[in-house]
Amino acid sequence: MAVKKPENMTFEATIEELDSLVDQLENGDLALDDALRKFERGIALARAGQTKLSDAEQRVSILLSEDDEAPLNDFKPDSE
């Protein structure tokens, strides 16, 4: 299986893989080279996850700040 670049993964997949890597590293049964490789992958995943989270927070902030003064209207489906 090809390893996906962290920036091409969903936030959830990034966190899931990062959690798995942390478990493996905490277990302590890895050879030094394997542990270092997994640590490097974990750092890349953590950075990508932080970027995705920051982007999402920024989008939410923009959406909440857009047109605060707009009146609220009842929802009317197109089928009416």
From Swiss-Prot:
Its main location: cytoplasm. Keywords: Cytoplasm, Exonuclease, Hydrolase, Nuclease. Pfam families: Exonuc_VII_S. It is an enzyme of class 3 (hydrolase). GO terms for cellular component: cytosol; exodeoxyribonuclease VII complex. The keyword Hydrolase applies. It is found in: Cytoplasm. GO terms for biological process: DNA catabolic process. It comes from the Bacteria. Its EC number is 3.1.11.6. The keyword Hydrolase applies. InterPro entries: Exonuc_VII_S, Exonuc_VII_ssu_sf. GO terms for molecular function: exodeoxyribonuclease VII activity. It catalyses: Exonucleolytic cleavage in either 5'- to 3'- or 3'- to 5'-direction to yield nucleoside 5'-phosphates. Belongs to the XseB family. Bidirectionally degrades single-stranded DNA into large acid-insoluble oligonucleotides, which are then degraded further into small acid-soluble oligonucleotides. NCBIfam families: PRK00977.1-1, PRK00977.1-4, xseB. Heterooligomer composed of large and small subunits. This is Exodeoxyribonuclease 7 small subunit. It comes from Vibrio parahaemolyticus serotype O3:K6 (strain RIMD 2210633). The lineage of its organism: Bacteria, Pseudomonadati, Pseudomonadota, Gammaproteobacteria, Vibrionales.
